[in-house]
Structures are given as C-alpha cells and as structure tokens.
Amino acid sequence: MQEQPLALVTGANRGIGREIARQLGERGYHVMLAARNAAEGIAAARELGLEFTPLDVTSQASIDRLAGSLERRKLGLDVLVHNAGVMFRHFDPEVARDTLAVNFFGPERLTQALLPHMRAHARVVIVSSGLGDRSALAPALRARFADGALDRPTLVALMEDFVARVAAGDHQAAGWPSYAYAVSKIGATMLAQVLARELADDPRKPRFNALCPGWVKTAMGGEGAQREVSEGADTAVWLATQAPGGPTGGFFRDRAPASW
C-alpha cells in the first residue's frame, strides 16, 4: 500500500524545478525528479535524496513509459508539476515548433497520460509565465482565448495553428505575435483553465492551476534576474500542497490570483 503522497516534477534537474522537488521532499512527499538530461537528473536526485525518472516531455514513447511504470508499481499520483521549459532568443519555424513541443504540448500530453493514475484531490501545477499575456494577440484571436466555452481540443488546435502558420509565413496576418515563448505560455496558462472545466465533475476533484514564478536566477533567467530559486518555487509548492477544495483553473503570482 502506498504510504507517502507522490509528486512528479518535470525539468527538475536544475533551477526552479529542482527547488520545487527539494521543497516537496522536505514536506514529506515521495518525489520523482523527472528530467531529459539523465546525468544531471541522477546527480540532482542523489544529492536531494529523491528518485530520478527519465522523461522527455516531447516524446510520447517516454511519456508512455513513465505512465507504464506507475501502473506496474501501482502508484497513485498526488502532485504533478509541469516545470520543464525552453526559451530561444531568436524566432523561426523550428523555434516555434520546438518551443511549443516542450512548453505546451508536453504538459498537455503528459497530463492526459497520467490522469488515470491520479488519486483523489490531485493537484496539477503548470509553471507558466507573465510573458504569456493575451494582449500580445490580435483582438479576434484574443477573443477566442477569452471564450469561456473554449475546450482542450480547440486549444490544442489553436496551438497547432500557430506552429503551422509560422512555418507558412503568415502567422502575423492571422493575429499571432513573432514570439514563440509568449504563445506557448498563453497556451500553458489556458491549459489549466480548460482542464479545470473539463474535469469539474470528476469525482476525484483534481485541481489545475498555472503560475508565474517571476524573473528568477536560473540558466534561463540569467544572473541579472531579481529572484532566487527559492522565491521562484514558492507559489508552485503552495499550489501543489493546497488542501482539498482549493482553487482550480487559476493563474497565480506570489500566492495571489494574477491577471494575464
């Protein structure tokens, strides 16, 4: 019988993800520290006394192996933190494809694969960004994201449309910005909302929320950033450890609802 609550944190070999994993471990969770870079992931897990699990969120085969491992071990998931992310300084069709693959499609597919293994009152936390601001979209496109009836298949189709239009060279005419990271985080924040609506009647009562960690001193954020990783991880851990009946479908910064 599973005694400890189980948490899985993606992109946890360094930075904010590593700190989230560390804090959850200190709170009594059995933490699966997931990372694509096996060498860094194994080293981080060993140092923190956690379990390493290999995971490439862009690979359906890798996702399926993880889900299969939970099934074989008869483990139920209490917390899933989507932290893995990439940001490129330039913009082209390859960047659009690769950014969305990690920052949006990875969390969407991983959540779907792990939903059958989630226990009652599971919390799914998406590390998004304030840069994912819907004001970057043209008004007609922005209205589609603001539609309270937007569902997951339609959201996925919108994200696929962005990638396809960048490849075709007409994304701006369709209302998209030339900033793949921003679009990916708009999608990631929206994913928490549509999942909360989609699973509102699930008897397990799962909770789905997204957050902005702020500008954090990590490999992505750089040394000029204003926040330490402990500050960047704080709201994610707070959402991951909410009591049953906590918020769902929200976007948070510094433990408070935020506009985007």
Which residue ranges define each predicted feature?
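Catalytic loop of short-chain dehydrogenase/reductase
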Residues: 86-93, 120-201
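Rossmann-fold scaffold of SDR-type NAD(P)-dependent oxidoreductases
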Residues: 10, 77-85, 121-129, 209
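Rossmann-fold cofactor-recognition segment
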Residues: 46-61
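C-terminal helical subdomain
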Residues: 109, 206, 210-218, 222-260
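Canonical Rossmann dinucleotide-binding motif of NAD(H)/NADP(H)-dependent dehydrogenases/reductases
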Residues: 1-32
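A hydrophobic alpha-helix adjacent to the NAD(P)-binding/active-site core of NAD(P)-dependent oxidoreductases
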Residues: 99-100
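Conserved glycine-rich Rossmann-like NAD(P)H-binding loop of the short-chain dehydrogenase/reductase
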Residues: 27-43
